[in-house]
Amino acid sequence: MFSQNMLIRDGEYTKSIYTMIKEERFQEAINVLNGIPEVSTTRAGLSLLGHCYYQTQDFIEASNCYEYLVNLVPDVPEYKLYYAQSLFQAGLFEEAHKISTTLDAPQLKDKVLQLQSAIAYGNEDYSTAQSLLLQRQDTSQEATVKNDEGCLLFQANMFEDALQRYVSALQAGGFNPHIAYNAALCHYRKKENSQALNYIAEIVERGIRNHPELGVGAQAETEGGARSVGNPPALAASGLAQAFNLKAAIEYQEGNVEGSREALTDLPPRLEPELDPVTLHNMALTDPVGGGAGLRRLAFLLELGPPTCPPETFANLLLLCCKHEMYDTAADILAEHTHLTYKYLSPYMYDLLDALITAQSTPEEAEQKLGVLANNIGGRLRSLAAKVQECRSAPDQNALRVALREYEFALESYLPVAMARAWIPWRADDFQGAEREFRASAEFCSETPTWRLHAAHVLFMRGDRYKEAAAFYEPIVRQNYDDILAVSASVLANLCVAYIMTSQNEEAEELMRKVERAEERKGNANGQCLHLCIVNLVIGTLYCAKGNYEFGLSRIAHALDGGSGARLCADTWLHVKRCVLGLLTGLSKQTIVLPSIAIQETLSFLRTCEAYGLTIPSVLTGPLEETGEQPPTIGLEARKLRALLLRLMEYNNFVSNTW
């Protein structure tokens, strides 16, 4: 008989199967066992098959095997325990609890209590979980006891006490990657990211050393082409998946989305169907392609429901919908999952999302809701600021740390509300109203990078506050001057425009040279660099808006390599369309006079865009937008614009000849 290219001779099945199990080649063992007809009716065969299925995390199949064993040998209570454990791991908590209550073997009492406590914990019934743990008679395993206590304290948001239990567990039982991860998670929730990263580094270092077969980092080295390692027991035992996901969460929280992606890329290579829910959730949030795949992944997880679905999924799906301005979709999700609203959304998060959705139909009502939120959190911030000042003069440094942490948490809640209040007038092009909202929130937020960035955008859009806008943009650029491409292209473009509008052309040129040199150094190793392209597009658009179409359009053509390069896409074409349409409007009204050579250059540019943009979509679609119609292309739109310009030239020539 052949199995995985290996011939098994008669009489050597037992030896071969046990060798596979010893070497943790469980899938091969399953394939061999399933090829033996007697396995499904014998105790030995079902026991081996159930064990292998359990180790490969196919808990449904494992539970089926142990269910047969319970009926086949009812006098062996261990099989009933394994059956209940398999059901629990499969997320079938009610069935697992029902089976566990029928177990009355004294020698298994502590294990049954442990399982029942885990079921209660999974059902978020923490008081029952604690009472069951207290009934255990065997307290010799101090590390396990401390870890369980830490988990219950963590769920009660008592992170400092939970951390102490985890540290005690590590001291009592030696290093355990799962307990070390729990300790790192406590530091993460306490905003102590450096300590959390220390634990993560140790988990990863030991995982790489002890399990080189997992191929940590192989995806990055092969650009995603590494062979999947699946979900072997070694991966579950190593804690690597949890560690890398926590590292990704830390990077994401600190605003380093690229670093978050890299952390997920360092995970042992697996196919998407093999990914655990937490990894799939985090990949959805950091998807570099766009929001579509991320939204679909989160929606898929939400449909799986608890306990498989991470509790953060519901809120993040709604926030991602709002980020992509899919407010109707967010409203539908809220309406379809009302049972999750009170379970997974805090009152603050619900009120914020409700205000964002309401703003689409009744902005005034949304402003009132956001105003109530802002006043409540603002009052709390003032009282916490006073508390921090009191603690600064007291000798208790721990009280000061707690007060500062509370203030930072409240500020994190206040900032999105302040941004949302400014966003409502921004959407209506009421930039003066948006500035007024920023001034109202300056008391608390003026030192936060997010507030300063968006305040700069508002001042820039005012059209007469370029100097003040530059004062906000400059620190952002200076902070990343050695890595200028880490700065958003829109920030660089707006700063250049602000310099030009305040007669600081030399500063604008120096900044553009800096960006150009950085792009030349980077080359094409990490994909297309569009920073300088976007800067030139924005500057060209500015000159067109001021009526200087000759220089503005030449700048735009230069930015897009004359329309023949890879920079031609829906994003960049939008700038071209606007400026050419502005030119056509001015020519038709005879408010613009353009030299013949400039018109010929524009026609040549549009002809090139037509040739190279034949298959490139010209419009940006939403992440979940699907239409049966063929989207318009840049080539088609360029041809129409060129035809309009030619017709205007013919008309103007006719008028000139008539006169």
From Swiss-Prot:
This is Tetratricopeptide repeat protein 30 homolog. TPR repeats lie at residues 3-36, 43-76, 143-176, 178-210, 391-424, 450-483, 533-566. Pfam families: TPR_16. Belongs to the TTC30/dfy-1/fleer family. Keywords: Cell projection, Cilium, Cilium biogenesis/degradation, Repeat, TPR repeat. InterPro entries: TPR-like_helical_dom_sf, TPR_rpt, TT30. It is found in: Cell projection, Cilium. Required for polyglutamylation of axonemal tubulin in sensory cilia. Plays a role in anterograde intraflagellar transport (IFT), the process by which cilia precursors are transported from the base of the cilium to the site of their incorporation at the tip. One of its GO terms (molecular function) is intraciliary transport particle B binding. Signal peptide: none annotated.
